[in-house]
Amino acid sequence: KYTDDELGTAIIADEVVREGFTYRMYNPNTGEHTFTKNPIEVIGNVSLGWNHEEDADFPAFGYDMDGSVPVYRLYSSATGLHHYTMDREEAMWDVEALGFDFEGVVFFALPADATEGSLVYRLYNPYDYQHLWTTNKGEYDYLGSIGWNQEGVAFKVQ
């Protein structure tokens, strides 16, 4: 492991891991995207064939900050997919009605109506039932043009 304290980054197994970021990974075999703040999970998933989409990483809080809200991560062993939501009721419905496992808070973000922060958009693919978050407006617009449902701004990040 190499750490560059000046940049706040670590390079582990040729992967750049930036402190304070939420990492986006893509599984080319399933089409799933997943998000984590855990650099060990990034390294493990990359070793299993996932792509770390470094350009899609975004800064997020690893702990509750004044005005922040939790983002929950759930997993369906039936489909092998993760689901993310800031809505506690949606998370509990996924657990009770759909059989998802509740994996807890993955990070904290600012609510969509916060006066500061960068926009994070949420999309839904009706063909494979997956959600995706992106800070890239071009990606959001493109995916909307090819059939993804654009759900608007989900939250904001620093």
Model region roles, listed by residue range:
Residues 1-158:
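Extracellular glycan-binding segments that recognize GlcNAc-based cell-wall polysaccharides
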